[in-house]
């Protein structure tokens, strides 16, 4: 028989990690603004007309929406300070918090597909050097709609009764089905394992193809290929690390190779590590993309140049 647990949401809240949430919201807001600026530049600046930037647009859009959703599905649900905000949202849009909670799983899939797409783009630049740019530039919006559809489909297999948040008699309550929740966690541990293997294999294939191409092109094209490959590999490496961490947490639930006291540390570190994939892309671009670095550091360089005797 299924175990149904009904708990007022405020009983699960505490002020224990309030400082961490505030810090995450601070750097998250700054990074989202940075990502919005990059989105604008990629869409309208001719300097970023290459098709790879269309894939980066998809990544940025996904990560912006994921970060916004995490406020309501994770961060605000941990602290009493934000309870009035959650109550207002649920009263205004009934079912909003339950949808937001399921959104965590939607973005789990979508972030994987967009990270994988960066590798697929790099491979297609070698296998179809003539037509790949036109294809990605022309169809990237339709491609993103398809990725969203697949992610929604994968998320829809979750039973609705596993976890939901409702307003009852003026109180927010969390309703969870223990057996269904365990099943969901097991399914996503399998997803994490499969996605990790896929990303690793595609990454290796991407390195193989790009290394062959680099030897056959001009110096200028070689620099561009290496830059885009570095961006793809670093981003893929970070995302693989998040998947591996999720797999380790799933294994720990069964084998308990870490003390129970580590549970709190695990959960807190998962939130921080999740930010690595959600918020890291603009900084990876700033490090490895000379065009972006010049654009944002131009004013600083000019000031420095004036001080040279």
UniProtKB/Swiss-Prot annotation:
Protein's membrane topology: Multi-pass membrane protein
Protein's GO biological process: sensory perception of chemical stimulus
Subcellular location: Membrane
Pfam families attached to this UniProt entry: Srg (PF02118)
GO cellular component terms listed in the entry, alphabetical order: cilium; membrane
Disulfide cysteine pairs (residue numbers): none
Keyword set includes Magnesium: no
Principal subcellular localisation of the protein: membrane
InterPro entries: 7TM_GPCR_serpentine_rcpt_Srg, NRL-Serpentine_Class_Gamma
Keywords per UniProt: Membrane, Transmembrane, Transmembrane helix
Transmembrane domains' residue ranges: 22-42, 140-160, 190-210, 230-250, 272-292
Presence of keyword Nuclease: no
GO molecular function, one term: transmembrane signaling receptor activity
PANTHER family in the record: SERPENTINE RECEPTOR CLASS GAMMA, SERPENTINE RECEPTOR CLASS GAMMA-RELATED
Identification of the protein by name: Serpentine receptor class gamma-47
Organism: Caenorhabditis elegans
Gene: srg-47
